[in-house]
Regions:
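Conserved strand-to-helix beginnings and helix N-cap segments that scaffold or border functional pockets
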Residues: 30-34, 63, 87, 167, ...
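Conserved nucleotide-binding/hydrolysis micro-motifs of P-loop NTPases
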Residues: 26, 54-59, 81-83, 127, ...
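Conserved Walker B catalytic segment
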Residues: 1-55, 63-66
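C-terminal leucine-rich, beta-strand-based interaction scaffolds used for sensing/assembly
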Residues: 42, 104, 149-237
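Short, glycine/charged-enriched secondary-structure capping and boundary segments
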Residues: 32-36, 64-68, 92, 226, ...
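Helix-loop-helix "sensor" segment of P-loop NTPases
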Residues: 57-111, 132-135
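Amphipathic alpha-helical "lid/sensor" segments that cap RecA-like P-loop NTPase cores
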Residues: 91-154
């Protein structure tokens, strides 16, 4: 009722309302809100909705049987950050404060992010916190365990636990190959299934942006050190 009154006031003044929601999840509250939003649209209020979240959470919300109207909304997939942009950003940040880093080390830390925005921020923070005036490969190796642990704890564990058993089996087969880019045929063989069967899980993991198609018939992890995480998780749990 309050939202409708607000929308009515803005409409009379010739104004529109944009509502933004971050880190969406298919909760009862969000489903209720989405229903109210749909009703406001039907009543021709000038209102728009912008939501952001992990790909699997967005898919879950769009596929809710009560919220199928969301399937008509425009979905924008965020691409990984450009490695060149990451490299330039690191260089500027360190040089601005008089801290040096050679090109080889700069390339090393850039590749360690794999274009993942959170990894870019986290790695930069951990290196900055060392207070070293020269960022060397030795400094990078020193913070590497902490970098991996933070990725695992803050992001990867929750992502992994929300996957289906077959999705887990798929990425486990990928991690066991030891290759950066893995043939789908090899994954199917490890899962003792044909390629048509596992294509469902391949498609789902692609939609969730956990893997990417690197070349015809091959896939790779999108997240840095994700294969290492899977192996460690399997060992510990």
């Amino acid at each position: 009722v309050l939202l409708e009154k607000m929308a009515e006031m803005l409409k009379k003044r010739g104004l529109s309302l944009l509502i933004t929601i971050d880190e969406i999840s298919s909760t009862p509250e969000l489903r209720e809100f989405a229903g109210i939003y749909q009703l406001l649209l039907r009543n021709n209020y000038h209102i728009a909705l912008l939501m952001a979240g992990l790909p699997n959470k967005v898919s879950e919300l769009q596929n809710d049987e009560l919220l199928t109207f969301l399937l008509r909304s425009q979905r924008i997939y965020l691409e990984p950050l450009s490695l060149l942009t990451i490299k330039q950003s690191y260089r500027r940040a360190f040089n601005r404060k008089g801290r040096t880093i050679d090109d080889d080390t700069l390339n090393q830390i850039t590749k360690m992010t794999n274009g993942y925005a959170y990894a870019f921020q986290l790695l930069g923070f951990l290196l900055w916190r060392t207070k070293e005036t020269e960022i060397t490969s030795a400094v990078v190796q020193k913070i590497l365990p902490n970098y991996q642990a933070e990725l695992y704890r803050n992001v990867y564990i929750k992502m992994y636990q929300e996957l289906s058993n077959k999705d887990r089996e798929f990425i486990k087969a990928m991690s066991e190959s030891g290759k950066a880019s893995v043939k789908v045929a090899e994954i199917a063989k490890k899962m003792h299934r044909d390629k048509n069967y596992i294509s469902i899980y391949r498609r789902r993991l692609l939609d969730d942006q956990l893997i990417t198609a690197t070349k015809w018939g091959e896939v790779a992890f999108t997240l840095p050190f994700f294969a290492d995480f899977i192996k460690e998780y399997q060992t510990l749990y």
